[in-house]
Amino acid sequence: MYAIIEAGGKQFCVEEGSKIFVSKIDAEVGTEIFFDKIFMIGGSSPQIGTPYINNAKVIAKVLEHGRDKKILVFKKWRRNDSRKLQGHRQDYTALKVTGIQL
């Protein structure tokens, strides 16, 4: 069974035991998080929400917090000999899906 959930403004397709990386969530390592914004649950009898499925939730456990690789943003203006280089590192939370409930 799989589910499509919304976490951090993005959609993820998850199964039991899968590991996902979402935008940083304020939760301690080892705690369980419940997602109730579920768009679809697939399997033998798929269900599609309008926009969400009522009384369904996905349970995930926080594995770690970290930071992604640095992304460089480079801007250049022609003929001015002007340029700007900026770096960005996004914080993330690693989650392991432990269950999908209807």
From Swiss-Prot:
SUPFAM superfamilies: L21p-like (SSF141091). Coiled coil: none annotated. The keyword rRNA-binding applies. Keywords: Ribonucleoprotein, Ribosomal protein, RNA-binding, rRNA-binding. GO terms for cellular component: cytoplasm; ribonucleoprotein complex; ribosome. GO terms for molecular function: rRNA binding; structural constituent of ribosome. Pfam families: Ribosomal_L21p (PF00829). InterPro entries: bL21-like, bL21-like_sf, Ribosomal_bL21. The keyword Transmembrane does not apply. GO terms for biological process: translation. Belongs to the bacterial ribosomal protein bL21 family. This protein binds to 23S rRNA in the presence of protein L20. Part of the 50S ribosomal subunit. Contacts protein L20. HAMAP family: Ribosomal_bL21. This is Large ribosomal subunit protein bL21. It comes from Lawsonia intracellularis (strain PHE/MN1-00). The lineage of its organism: Bacteria, Pseudomonadati, Thermodesulfobacteriota, Desulfovibrionia, Desulfovibrionales. The gene is rplU.
